[in-house]
Amino acid sequence: MQYIFKLPNKYTFEKESIKGTNFESKELSDKAKFAVIETETGHEARIREKDCDFHYYILEGKGNFEIDGKIEECQKGDLAIIPSGSIFKYSGKMKLLLMTIPWWRPEQEETF
């Protein structure tokens, strides 16, 4: 069984103005999903995640998160927590570690 997951050296997804890499760890644990996301400008479409809480840890850079209409600045070392059902977007040049609880699936997401 694999317990250590290396960051893949190529992107596994791209959408809007973000690109990222998923850690393929579901076989070991399907309770949380992890991805590293990079963006030059942010994610301008508003998102509502119906089933997952999103936890974004800012690895590099700075920007803003708008969560349920409230805008807050963030920078390297900060953690943004978005509860399921909240509407959010983010802007700025950042590298983020995303943890979703439970495991994220595309059909759970609405964009505006």
Regions picked out by a protein language model, each given a short descriptive name:
Residues 84-109:
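Ligand-binding loop in jelly-roll beta-barrel domains
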Residues 1-36, 46, 111-112:
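A short, N-terminal "cap"/entry segment at the start of jelly-roll beta-barrel domains
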Residues 25-33, 39-57, 67-68:
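A short beta-loop-beta micro-motif enriched in histidine and acidic residues
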Residues 68-85:
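Short acidic-glycine-tyrosine-enriched beta hairpin
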